[in-house]
């Protein structure tokens, strides 16, 4: 009985370990001063195409990515948004699949702070822009694809949020100085 229990626990651990998503990071800076690291785990078992887009943009392996890109929209008690790899002002950005790609699914919900979700201009318009929730945002369910979550550095997300305004225009220049895969 004891041996069987250990084997069952071992299987549970190995199954959950195999479901862990890829891990990526940002090292953001405020007005040129690095403020720490944000680490994410991607839901590549739920939304593999969306997660791969973000991972590849973190590494810059396609020739462009998030390094040097600002958080251009920050609204306290809502979210921080970035990822405009073209224009850097919120009006650009492209995916690794071309200009835009379709919403993969809406399985994951905006039910807590620290979620990574695709910013878009309506259905099936995902590019490179993303946001990180700072509170639960259930009104976004079914409209934006959740594809990962913050695993370390939520204090850094909250620090970035503190530079936000009701209009979304940041009160400081906040840039992703480094990004990559862990």
Swiss-Prot record:
Assigned protein family: Belongs to the cyclophilin-type PPIase family.
GO MF annotation: an example: peptidyl-prolyl cis-trans isomerase activity
Locations listed in the record: Mitochondrion matrix
Domain named PPIase cyclophilin-type: residues: 25-181
GO process annotations (BP): apoptotic process; protein folding
Organism: Saccharomyces cerevisiae (strain ATCC 204508 / S288c)
Protein's job: PPIases accelerate the folding of proteins. It catalyzes the cis-trans isomerization of proline imidic peptide bonds in oligopeptides. This isozyme is required for growth on lactate at high temperature.
Gene: CPR3
UniProt xrefs under SUPFAM superfamilies: Cyclophilin-like
Transit peptide interval: 1-20
Summary of activators and inhibitors of this protein: Inhibited by the immunosuppressant drug cyclosporin A and by SDZ NIM811, a PPIase inhibitor.
Record-linked PROSITE patterns: CSA_PPIASE_1, CSA_PPIASE_2
Superkingdom of this protein's organism: Eukaryota
E.C. code: 5.2.1.8
Catalysed reaction equations from the record: [protein]-peptidylproline (omega=180) = [protein]-peptidylproline (omega=0)
Record's GO cellular component terms: cytoplasm; mitochondrial matrix; mitochondrion
This protein's UniProt keywords: Isomerase, Mitochondrion, Rotamase, Transit peptide
Other notes: Present with 1960 molecules/cell in log phase SD medium.
Name this protein carries in UniProt: Peptidyl-prolyl cis-trans isomerase C, mitochondrial
């Amino acid at each position: 009985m004891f041996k069987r229990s250990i084997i069952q626990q071992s299987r549970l651990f190995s199954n959950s370990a195999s479901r862990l998503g890829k891990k990526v990071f940002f090292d953001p800076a405020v007005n040129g001063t690095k403020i720490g690291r944000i680490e994410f785990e991607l839901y590549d078992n739920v939304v593999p195409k969306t997660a791969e887009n973000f991972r590849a943009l973190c590494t810059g392996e396609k020739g462009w990515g998030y390094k040097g890109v600002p958080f251009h929209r920050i609204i306290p008690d809502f979210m921080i948004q970035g990822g405009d790899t073209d224009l850097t002002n919120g009006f650009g950005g492209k995916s690794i699949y071309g200009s835009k790609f379709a919403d993969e699914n809406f399985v994951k919900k905006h039910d807590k702070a620290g979620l990574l979700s695709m910013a878009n201009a309506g259905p099936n318009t995902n590019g490179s822009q993303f946001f990180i929730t700072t509170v639960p945002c259930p009104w976004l369910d079914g409209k934006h694809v959740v594809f990962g979550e913050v695993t370390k550095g939520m204090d850094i997300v909250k620090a970035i949020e503190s530079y936000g305004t009701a209009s979304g225009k940041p009160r400081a220049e906040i840039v992703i100085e480094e990004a990559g895969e862990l």
